[in-house]
Amino acid sequence: MTVMKFDLIKKEGKARRGKITFPRGDIQTPAFMPVGTYGAVKSLSPVELKEMGAEIILGNTFHLWLRPGTEIIKKHGSLHGFNGWDKPILTDSGGFQVFSLGKMRKLTEEGVTFKSPINSSKVFLSPEISMQVQRDLGSDIVMCFDECTPYPATEKEAKESMELSMRWAKRSKEAHGDNPSALFGIIQGGMYEHLRDESLAKLKEIDFDGFAIGGLSVGEPKEDMIRILDHTAHQMPEDKPRYLMGVGTPKDLVEAVYRGVDMFDCVMPSRNARNGHIFTSEGVIKIRNSKYKDDTSLLDPNCDCYTCKNFTKSYLHHLDKTKEILGSRLNTIHNLTFYQNLMKSIRKALDEGRFSEFRKEFLASYK
């Protein structure tokens, strides 16, 4: 029996306002989860994450398993004890990372054999191992082990990949056993609606605590992503959280909420911050651009983060040009605050019954 509880508070069209409850804390949905690949959101402390409103972060099973390894993390009690984050943590299963290794991996019914990106040693990962690693990490939300269907994929390739993921989903559920953490199933099927339907039906049969849409934002055109979202999101169980994996831009988040999604994660706000791409209420600023060299205005007048209250575009441009670590930190503080504030605005609009209006205004003003 899972310790997770999900309450659907309100709906506007397909958009949903909810709350996920864990012993470690509540998550107001729709929610964005900052990504802490190696147990840390790059350059930020848990205190800073809490200050910007994050209620859950994501950890990477694959990378934490390889380094530092679960034995070291278990000595701290859990990943929470290791990284000082005392709120909920979701861990992905490692399936996407194995998929991204490409030719370095060998896929069989049993699992995946691959060369470690750290020391090139041979490593084997299976649904059973992934479930054990996530149990050792003490994850609040565990993701079942799947193969992320590549793009492009023929219908035959997508079907074979999806069916393998469904067999692995069943094994993940069995291996999860009496672990009280929530276990989410992952819908695959590439860009084929009928395969997505088949995948969802099989996952419902196995019965998970939450459901995720995987295999999107892997290189497909935006219209294909929206088409699959349109077709799939509203068919997911009404009484369980719906998670869109690895997506996306601010517009993507608004559009996915409109279609009934509750949870998101993406490296985009933190990765883009390190490359000088800053999200603001009026669109993206490329702070590396020379036009900001003597721009004494603040970054975003509509943002109350530490960066926006204290530093000019000129200073942030200077930090970027000189490759100062502080520049990456300040940009990351802002970008992740922007994402958390966007989710707060979405939740407020849903609370007040004006999300449709909010969506129209946001899509019109955000460039």
Curated annotation (Swiss-Prot):
The keyword Transferase applies. Pfam families: TGT. It catalyses: 7-aminomethyl-7-carbaguanine + guanosine(34) in tRNA = 7-aminomethyl-7-carbaguanosine(34) in tRNA + guanine. The keyword Membrane does not apply. InterPro entries: ArchSynthase1/Queuine_TRR, TGT, TGT-like_sf, tRNA_ribo_trans-like. The active site is at D92 (proton acceptor), D265 (nucleophile). Pathway: tRNA modification; tRNA-queuosine biosynthesis. One of its GO terms (biological process) is tRNA wobble guanine modification. GO terms for cellular component: cytosol. Binds 1 zinc ion per subunit. Its EC number is 2.4.2.29. Keywords: Glycosyltransferase, Metal-binding, Queuosine biosynthesis, Transferase, tRNA processing, Zinc. Its cofactor is Zn(2+). Residues 246-252 are annotated as: RNA binding. Zn(2+) binds at C303, C305, C308, H334. Homodimer. Within each dimer, one monomer is responsible for RNA recognition and catalysis, while the other monomer binds to the replacement base PreQ1. PANTHER family: QUEUINE TRNA-RIBOSYLTRANSFERASE (PTHR46499:SF1). Belongs to the queuine tRNA-ribosyltransferase family. This is Queuine tRNA-ribosyltransferase. It comes from Francisella tularensis subsp. mediasiatica (strain FSC147).
